[in-house]
Amino acid sequence: MVRRVLPAPPAAVWEEWLDAEGMAEWMCPRPARPTKIELDPRPGGELRIDIDDEGAELSITGRYLELDEPRRLRFTWSCSAWQPPANSVVTVTLTPHGDEQTLMTIHHAKLPPDVLDSHQNGWALIGEQLEARLTRGGQRTR
């Protein structure tokens, strides 16, 4: 589980999780970069993130399970690199914290044992990258 206080209210953080263009800036732990993000944010809607991880191409796919705006987001998560294939579940909880801040909690369940540590570290880096984007007011960098 990863927790991070972000410099924006829950509604603004929620929007980041549903905006493919903005998500391209923070979703993958650097140096990996998303090459394409497709989101259909509704229960049963699909998500897909194609990634270039220093020359290795992989895809994250899943389905939205729950969207409780702006509090809770749940979706399945499967990586094309996982052998054997597996489905895990990501739960993102957004709680008001202080003045115009959000406590974001990311819980990633049902992960294959061999990727537990890398995903824990990856979500921590993603939290840092999202914080940096929100600190800039959501402005894209190149």
List each model region and its residues.
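Hydrophobic ligand-binding cavity/cleft-lining segments
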Residues: 1-33
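Short, hydrophobic/aromatic-enriched beta-strand segments in well-ordered soluble domains
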Residues: 4, 106-108
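Hydrophobic pocket/interface hotspot
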Residues: 13, 23, 47, 64, ...
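Hydrophobic-ligand binding "helix-grip"
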Residues: 24, 28-29, 38, 42, ...
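A conserved amphipathic terminal alpha-helix motif
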Residues: 81, 110-142
